[in-house]
From Swiss-Prot:
Example of a GO MF term: toxin activity
Keywords linked to the UniProt accession: Disulfide bond, Hemostasis impairing toxin, Platelet aggregation inhibiting toxin, Secreted, Signal, Toxin
Predominant cellular place of this UniProt entry's protein: secreted
Localization per record: Secreted
Other remarks in the entry: Negative results: lacks hemorrhagic activity in rabbits. Has no inhibitory effect on the coagulation cascade of humans. Does not agglutinate human erythrocytes of four groups (AC, BC, OC, ABK) and rabbit erythrocytes as well, which indicates it is not really a lectin.
Organism expressing this protein natively: Deinagkistrodon acutus
Family: Belongs to the snaclec family.
Pfam families given in the database record: Lectin_C
Name listed for the protein in its UniProt record: Snaclec agkicetin-C subunit beta
Cellular component GO terms held in the UniProt record: extracellular region
Amino acid sequence: MGRFIFVSFGLLVVFLSLSGTGADCPPDWSSYEGNCYLVVKEKKTWAEAQKFCTEQRKECHLVSFHSAEEVDFVVSKTFPILSYDLVWIGLNNIWNDCMLEWSDGTKLTYKAWSGIPECIISKTSDNQWLSRACSRTQPFVCKFQA
């Protein structure tokens, strides 16, 4: 009986230490692969959303995606909270200086952007990225490295 209690206590200690791996994230944030994510339902412009994120923590920004698995994780968090599937992400063309090149390989030296800064939203239901005027309001996702 004493051995059973000792083993049970040891397993409890291991479980509690492992369950604390996401504890680096503040309350209401979700943890994935060493990053913390916050889904914000309130609609803001891209700049307001980015400002909101940086006000949470200095190193926090609108979400950036680096794998399909990360997108799937964010979708699993946004779907239950939002009534629709469009959220601001960290991509933008505010400075109109995309690193584009012509199909013949020459650099983009002449620019004729429309003058309306474009920011990127993610359609989380099918992982499409769409360009929208930065002045439109959308929900968004913040991210920082834990």
